[in-house]
């Protein structure tokens, strides 16, 4: 990952390849130091691979000035010789690093030196600066470890324990941030005075550096360089016996050679952080997979799945646990990491192959163990602490529940002592197939969907049918004896049925049998006998002739004159069958029109010919009837309005009294009674005035 351009210093591990221009150390100091190191069993062998490297071909050559043999104190040399023989296998590994782009510091004059990422500064080192050679034995390591522990509290803001590179797992990967602990191999820097320099009075390992220069190379394009390691190169670089050196720049540009990292102490921390990150990643993947599988796919809920759940909770060992254990036992390269991630992805998204396993179970018997393994893994993954099994059982889909109930019922019926009976099924080609109901029909996995559907749809049936000879199913329709249901199975694509087969169930009458079913078309077809059609036509003609013989009919009741008191009259100019009407029928019609609230003109006008009615009816005055009805309507309206006014007045009085605060219930009741009496007296006066007129 790319580091942020902020306060976190970066350390760039440099391994010069063949393409980079390397330069042998020249001068008496370098040769004498090389000779002294080669004489000590090649403890600090300065080969051309691990000496200074330039960033580009056009850059200035990197010529580091090493110490001369005379400048190294005799005590340090003797101590190093004795310690080196004892601790030859524990030689530290140092890498050339460059602290880049850091601008942190609590005080104004303190902090890390800001060094350009593209080039190194080429400057003279002050006389007060010193270069400490930090690989003279375990006593010097112990003293520096004590110094690190003292200064952990003051530089805790620059620490990042959890950072690790995602590309390299060996000790020489490119680290973007500066770790703080000694096991990580870096040295924290506080202020202008380097905190990693040892005092001359306590260690006597400081070396004069009057004429030393910091090697640097400045490119015209200011392009930074970084060394990219492959996993094998990094592994060989870690196991190599050649030590590297790390340069740390502080505010006063004091170069210090220190022990950069120790692989044996660094490995447990890095592996623990890697395992923790992988464990959280696997946990997230398993949660996503289980949630998506429980949401989008219906589980196969049966007795087998219940047993599988109990077995998987006891005996199932997750491959992820085995993978994490194997990675804890030894170091892993980047190829192992990529293989582990591929395995994690296949485990996390195995729910995508879950439905494939279930469908292959219904198509082929040989794939049943693989489908059971998928079911075990999904059940073991779903039994996490974040979603309990009881809650998932309550959220079982409806169709899965129905399928489970059908299987339970079919298993109970198959175990019961029921004699085998023959059922009659009809294929779509109208050929009758006789099937024997076997008690062990549930043993075949291909017949599970049909058995469950038939037993759930026909609850009163005896047993479940079985497919004939395991061939193609063109579609079956049949009836279970002793039941009122008829089911039909659609044709399947293969020799067996899938889980999502839809079975059609019809309710049939009690007196239905197979022969009636065959004669359905004959009975449903209408009879086209010409003799019956002729008889119908003759009866219709006779009715028409009878109507003609009856003569005139009333246009309201469609009957002839029955008595002399109810004769047929011609009220208007209508002709034909609408010409005549009974007197009583006409009176009823006119009365209905008056009661409906029609006007006098509308009552005395014919609705068909729009002519005025010419009526001479006994005891029937249209004008008088219309006026009486109008008076009644006015009285009704007056009473309705009066009652409305009384109620409105009462409400207004009550609200007024409430507002004035003088609400007295007896007085209000008396006033209401007086108002009602006044209204009744007014109504009596109106009635007397109408009688006078």
UniProtKB/Swiss-Prot annotation:
Pathway as given in its UniProt record: Protein modification; protein ubiquitination
Expression sites by tissue: Expressed in brain, thymus, muscle and kidney.
Catalysed transformations (reactions): S-ubiquitinyl-[E2 ubiquitin-conjugating enzyme]-L-cysteine + [acceptor protein]-L-lysine = [E2 ubiquitin-conjugating enzyme]-L-cysteine + N(6)-ubiquitinyl-[acceptor protein]-L-lysine
Subcellular location: Cytoplasm
Zinc finger residue extent: RING-CH-type: 546-616
CDD domains xrefs: RING_CH-C4HC3_MARCH7
EC number assigned by the record: 2.3.2.27
Name this polypeptide is given: E3 ubiquitin-protein ligase MARCHF7
